[in-house]
């Protein structure tokens, strides 16, 4: 049972990818009239207990993602417009931004990859100043900037803060990536016993780094 966070355009693309491979999934979104409900044949359920085999829509936000890990999803598609893994941690463990460590992280990153920083997070990209191509295959040489990437962004993030827990968004097809459900479950266990934690989600080209601490 895979999990799609967000029922918009990219959530629908993720669902169609899974359907082509005959995989079960559940989409979570706060809006019961979202694009996924209009375009896909989904069974709407009101609780996690109702999710069995099949394709489901469950109304709710990031706060229910940790509970869905009991299904041992292989893929989690973080299509919502926020740092899904970090927000799941923040809500589950009542964390707040750890702003003091941001300067350390930014200081270890090339200035040209930093898109924005603040409120405990740093957004990074090898294509900082332009829009990416639709359905990009993420080659070593960026088709927009024409610059060769020195390494995948997830490796650069790990270099910038070696103690970070980096979730790799792996490309499943051009323009579509997912993180590992097993890795997210490991992150949740680590966060249980940490006073402070830095979590990042990154693919080959882009990433977001979020620092959190106990409230």
Curated annotation (Swiss-Prot):
Highest taxon, organism lineage: Archaea
InterPro entries found in the cross-reference section: FAD/NAD-bd_sf
Protein name per UniProt: Uncharacterized protein AF_1314
Species this chain originates from: Archaeoglobus fulgidus (strain ATCC 49558 / DSM 4304 / JCM 9628 / NBRC 100126 / VC-16)
Record lineage: Archaea, Methanobacteriati, Methanobacteriota, Archaeoglobi, Archaeoglobales
């Amino acid at each position: 049972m895979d999990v799609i966070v967000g029922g918009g355009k990219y959530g629908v693309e993720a669902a169609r990818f899974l359907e082509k491979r005959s995989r079960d999934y559940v989409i979570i979104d706060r809006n019961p009239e979202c694009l996924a409900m209009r375009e896909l044949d989904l069974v709407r359920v009101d609780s996690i207990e109702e999710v069995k085999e099949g394709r489901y829509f469950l109304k709710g936000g990031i706060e229910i993602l940790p509970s869905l890990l009991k299904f041992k999803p292989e893929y989690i598609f973080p299509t919502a417009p926020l740092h899904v893994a970090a927000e799941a941690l923040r809500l589950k463990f009542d964390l707040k931004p750890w702003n003091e460590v941001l300067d350390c992280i930014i200081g270890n990153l090339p200035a040209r990859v930093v898109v924005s920083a603040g409120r405990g997070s740093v957004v990074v990209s090898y294509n900082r100043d332009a829009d990416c191509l639709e359905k990009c295959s993420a080659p070593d040489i960026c088709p927009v900037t024409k610059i060769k990437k020195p390494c995948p962004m997830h490796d650069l993030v790990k270099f910038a803060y070696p103690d970070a827990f980096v979730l790799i968004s792996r490309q499943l097809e051009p323009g579509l990536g997912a993180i590992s459900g097993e890795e997210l479950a490991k992150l949740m266990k680590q966060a249980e016993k940490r006073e402070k934690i830095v979590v990042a989600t990154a693919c080959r080209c882009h990433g977001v780094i979020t620092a959190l601490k106990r409230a």
